[in-house]
Amino acid sequence: MATQASVEWIFNVAGSAASASLAKSIKDAGGSEDFAKYVVARFYDNYKDSIDDSGIYNACMGRARTVDKALNDSRLAERNEEWHTNLATIRRLDLELAELKLMLSNLGMKREERVLNSMFSVTREEGRSSNVVMLKQNAVKMIEEGKLKIKVEKNENYTESLKNKIEELECIIGAFEKGKEINIALDAMTGEVRLDGDSCSYNSTAAFVSTIMGTPIKMYDESNKPLFDVGKYINPKHVIDKMIESEIPIFKSDYRNNESPDFDAWNENSNLKIVSVNDCHAICVFKFENEWWCFDDGRLRKYNGIGNPLIVANSKFQIDRILISGDIELNPGPNALVKLNDCITKYNLKIICTFDVNLDDDGSIMYICYLKVGSAEATGNGCSKKEAKRRAAVSILDQLGM
């Protein structure tokens, strides 16, 4: 089929190239654009009739079918019941193929364009302006045989999330070339978190997408409005769809939701999920070292297994580390840290700050901050380093009379 498709493409390109050349010649000679369009339209109709009536089209397609059959099984390469391919036939086909390549080259269709067209196709998803590049069977076969190497061009101006997706693509290609099972190691992390009792869908989706992207995702603008606002229909499935609409680099091949036909199979093997708890709360759960953990509105704790999966990640994603952000502010209040830093600078005070980590009774991680400023000492507990340090800073400011 590949040769037949190539021949069909050659005829289409030849007609288009000739039409464009004819239109340009008419305009260069002073003809109007309307006249050029009229002549080109008549030419293209005559061109199709000509290659059909002359038998050139059918002859070329017949030879293409012969080549395709010869590629699949030389014994099946029949032109008719009594005719089989032989060395002379192949020589003639090679010569004609070389002539066609020369013709394309003269029309401006260079080798790079011919090769790319034989291996890739471009489709567009309905309702979206972006394009999807698909591998043709010819390219897949060449990858399996080790004849095709895919390199991804890198740029220092790429965002961190895009660099991570490129590295992921390179890992997939490498595993595919070596015939190995594809595994992508991820760091579990949260995105930007907000605690107001209504943001669990945003929080859980932020953790899910941030983990896949490899970088914490920003969820709110300067006015504290959601960047991926879904209005009243707050559901992780709607939030992640909004992210894709906003061209966040997460793809349909990365996950499935509970409306997908193959959801059950994905759910069974997935290591990263968004789970609905009692149909009123959403958390991001993940498997780490054979135990299930979760980010519950930014708090890391052991997962108790309660809930129904809404979104599950591709099983190729595996968690090998947990990153706990020290910048998640769960209960901001007055900015004691800024005030304390001003005092330290103003009075030239020495500061000692260390952190310890413990597991709380419910399995969540609790930070302990030991803070000493001058002669004042205090400790603070919190679900993040920043929260623990802020609470210790409040105590220090009280001791210093500020």
UniProtKB/Swiss-Prot annotation:
Protein name listed in UniProt: Non-structural protein 3
Q: Which Pfam families match?
A: Rota_NSP3
Similarity annotation: Belongs to the rotavirus NSP3 family.
Output the GO biological process annotations, alphabetical, semicolon-separated: regulation of translation
Matching Gene3D superfamilies? 3.30.160.20, 3.30.70.1610, Rotavirus non-structural protein NSP3, N-terminal domain (6.10.280.20)
Could you tell me what this protein does?
A: May play a role in stimulating the translation of viral mRNAs.
Q: Which GO terms describe its molecular function?
A: RNA binding
Q: Per the record, where is site Cleavage? A: G333, P334
- In its UniProt entry, the species of origin is given as Rotavirus C (isolate RVC/Cow/Japan/Shintoku/1991/G2P[3]) (RV-C)
- Which keywords does UniProt give here? Coiled coil, Host cytoplasm, RNA-binding, Translation regulation
Principal cellular location given in the protein's record? host cell
Task: Tell me yes or no: is RNA-binding among this UniProt entry's keywords.
Answer: yes
Location relative to the cell = Host cytoplasm
Residues in coiled coil: 87-113, 147-181
Give the record's GO CC terms. Answer: host cell cytoplasm
- Organism's domain of life? Viruses
Domain DRBM, residue spans: 334-402
Q: Does the keyword Protein transport apply?
A: no
